[in-house]
């Protein structure tokens, strides 16, 4: 059952556009599980890290994340997922990131 394509395949989670999830880059840590995130729609949001992610996944400045904006306050949101550097580079190489947040683009 060897498949040569499995070695080179990287599977990454993408935002669910139907539920309003978008890409974002963490700009600043605000403390108390809060972050300032620049989102792909050009809005800077004050996002929080949900309790189930706090201890499991550490988030730093410059990380690529998936944000779900709040329905009742558009300037706030929740962090859904954090990409590793390898996953972020993969998304950038395959042009899956919007230009506004593609800071992983390697100039060649």
Swiss-Prot record:
Coiled coil: none annotated. InterPro entries: NA-bd_OB-fold (IPR012340), RNA-binding_domain_S1_IF1 (IPR006196), TIF_eIF-1A (IPR001253), TIF_eIF-1A_CS (IPR018104). It comes from the Archaea. GO terms for molecular function: RNA binding; translation initiation factor activity. PROSITE patterns: IF1A, S1_IF1_TYPE. Pfam families: eIF-1a (PF01176). Residues 10-84 form the S1-like domain. Keywords: Initiation factor, Protein biosynthesis. PANTHER family: EIF-1A. Seems to be required for maximal rate of protein biosynthesis. Enhances ribosome dissociation into subunits and stabilizes the binding of the initiator Met-tRNA(I) to 40 S ribosomal subunits. Belongs to the eIF-1A family. This is Translation initiation factor 1A. The gene is eif1a.
């Amino acid at each position: 059952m060897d498949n040569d394509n499995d070695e080179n395949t990287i599977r990454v989670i993408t935002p669910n556009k139907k539920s309003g999830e978008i890409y974002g880059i963490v700009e600043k840590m605000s403390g108390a599980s809060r972050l300032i995130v620049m989102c792909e729609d050009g809005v800077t949001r004050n996002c929080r890290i949900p309790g189930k992610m706090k201890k499991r996944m550490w988030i730093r400045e410059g990380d690529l994340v998936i944000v779900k904006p709040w329905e009742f306050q558009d300037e706030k949101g929740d962090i859904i997922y954090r990409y590793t550097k390898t996953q972020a580079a993969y998304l950038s190489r395959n042009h899956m990131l919007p230009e506004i947040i593609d800071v992983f683009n390697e100039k060649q």
